[in-house]
Amino acid sequence: MAEFTHLVNERRSASNFLSGHPITKEDLNEMFELVALAPSAFNLQHTKYVTVLDQDVKEKLKQAANGQYKVVSSSAVLLVLGDKQAYQQAADIYEGLKVLGILNKQEYDHMVQDTVSFYENRGEQFKRDEAIRNASLSAMMFMLSAKEKGWDTCPMIGFDAEAVKRILNIDDQFEVVMMITIGKEKTESRRPRGYRKPVNEFVEYM
């Protein structure tokens, strides 16, 4: 418990990164193995990550992100995508429950149909909202996992989502939820932590 408290207290949004700290796919995959355990509605795992290590592509993303330098100084840039059609994978995702005998065929069929109907009956706005909700849960898990591995991150919303889609050839079924830069923070330029509301200002008991 003390370790988690320390992790949360140490995690900051890094505005400046040190150069010369490349990150490998192996480093990132260790984090993604933990991210895979993030909660998602109906276990649909709506989130996809497009991870950019190539410096030339990062330069293009910098332009789409209003010229923010941390995009190119970071070790990698992640685009967190939410799949608006994730419910269509319900049959594949639940297949294992049937194979293991946890669900019989009738229960499996009902579970798939109930999930699909839940989304289709609520329309396109709900599908988009769900993509954003679930991808945001996953993104927070990634940032904590990164910090636990000794890396610093910054979640970003200041970018042109349509430009990002064009640069990375992202299909319209995905919502670009946020951009995350990751690297080693240049701590000497870090500002003090911003004001945080006391608990009684954001929690209500009834």
From Swiss-Prot:
InterPro entries, A to Z: Nitroreductase, Nitroreductase-like
Listed EC numbers: 1.-.-.-
Binding site for FMN: R11, R12, S13, Q68, Y69, K70, I157, G158, R193, R196
GO cellular component: cytoplasm
Coiled coil: none
Cited Pfam families: Nitroreductase
Induction, per UniProt: Repressed by MhqR. Strongly induced by stress due to exposure to 2-methylhydroquinone (2-MHQ) and less strongly induced after diamide or catechol stress. Not induced by oxidative stress due to hydrogen peroxide or methylglyoxal.
Cofactor(s) required for function per UniProt: FMN
Top-level taxon of the source organism: Bacteria
Listed CDD domains: MhqN-like
Keywords from the named record: Aromatic hydrocarbons catabolism, Cytoplasm, Detoxification, Flavoprotein, FMN, NAD, NADP, Oxidoreductase
GO biological process: catabolic process; response to toxic substance
UniProt keyword Flavoprotein, yes or no: yes
Gene Ontology molecular functions: oxidoreductase activity
First-tier enzyme category under EC: oxidoreductase
Subcellular localization(s) per the UniProt record: Cytoplasm
Similarity annotation: Belongs to the nitroreductase family.
Subunit structure: Homodimer.
Function: Putative nitroreductase that may contribute to the degradation of aromatic compounds.
Protein name: Putative NAD(P)H nitroreductase MhqN
Organism (species): Bacillus subtilis (strain 168)
